[in-house]
Amino acid sequence: MEFNDVLTNQPICIDNGSGVIKAGFAGEDQPKSFFPSYVGRPKHLKIMAGAIEGDIFIGNKAQELRGLLKIKYPIEHGIVVDWDDMERIWQFIYTEELKTVSEEHPVLLTEAPLNPRTNRDQAAQVFFETFNVPALFTSIQAVLSLYASGRTTGVVLDSGDGVTHAVPIYEGFAMPSAIRRIDIAGRDVTEYLQLLLRKSGTIFHTSAEKEIVRIIKEKCSYVTLDPRKEEKEWINASISGGKDYTKEEEFKLPDGNVLRLGAERFRAPEILFDPEIIGSEYSGIHQVVVDAISRVDLDLRKSLFGNIVLSGGSTLTRGFGDRLLSEIRRLAVKDVKIKIFAPPERKYSTWIGGSILASLSTFRKMWVSAEEYQEDPDIIHRKSI
């Protein structure tokens, strides 16, 4: 099959998230495949002939058998730390999820900005040499989120499981020198919630139980507008024996026990705005946005403040947008108009943006072909967004 013929095939778009991987065919409005990006291996000895076959589990099967498995994420803070497992996940996407062959479809792959060059080099090597893809294109996640929102100007705040970054884009031009990134995101919130629950007497220690903590975080946590005031209210409620304090929430654990959640619900996501709580020297998420905007030309700042677009699972936390707005107001120039857009589909917006971009006929010249890659592997750094 000629290269140009292969390029007319539907591209595959893979949003390679630290916590959740999204994959599907370009041109579709949502990913066909969506599952936690971990690999599970049985941690117990198999003694019965009828036991489940296989020694590696990925996707929904890994979620179902979570309690039997040792769970490992191959991506940490946006960077692949285990390439063998990463390759297994990509293979699983092709064979089990999309049910297609890698040789016939170009691939659009996402990655976090300011990642080490070696991460992209290795990914390209796997796709071209192991999967024999006809063409590849690598894009920064935030840029695609802006595509999905239908804008060409804005600052995208993308906070997923491993990385939080703010990327200013003006009339379609990304500004690499203004990109700000912090390695504090959803997984750190999960780990801190795990610690807070341990302090209150509920211990989750296995890798599978940590997944339960993640679900508790997603269902029960919220961001408060005023943490000091909220803290006082909780302290007063506990002093007055407030067992029925209205903000307490119950969560039913898989074994049927009920967990009562108190102040942990807002204390855990608070680390996004105040990373010092966990001893980190990173700036808060609101500071990251303002820093990114303040690094661009004075003339452009006004329109960026008026177009802040949220993306990624961590921004779905209840109260996140309101708190972000109030914190940015405090840091920004007095009369500047601040508008935050929170698209309802922002959990998938990077993938949706990639799907739109890869299906454009004008995008065809952007692909890095296998032939170009063989001649000059460095081209994947030059031909990218």
UniProtKB/Swiss-Prot annotation:
Gene3D superfamilies: 3.30.420.40, Actin, Chain A, domain 4. Disulfide bonds: none annotated. Pfam families: Actin (PF00022). Its main location: cytoplasm. It is found in: Cytoplasm, Cytoskeleton. One of its GO terms (molecular function) is ATP binding. GO terms for cellular component: cytoplasm; cytoskeleton. Keywords: ATP-binding, Cytoplasm, Cytoskeleton, Nucleotide-binding. InterPro entries: Actin (IPR004000), Actin/actin-like_CS (IPR020902), ATPase_NBD (IPR043129). Belongs to the actin family. ARP1 subfamily. This is Actin-2. It comes from Pneumocystis carinii.
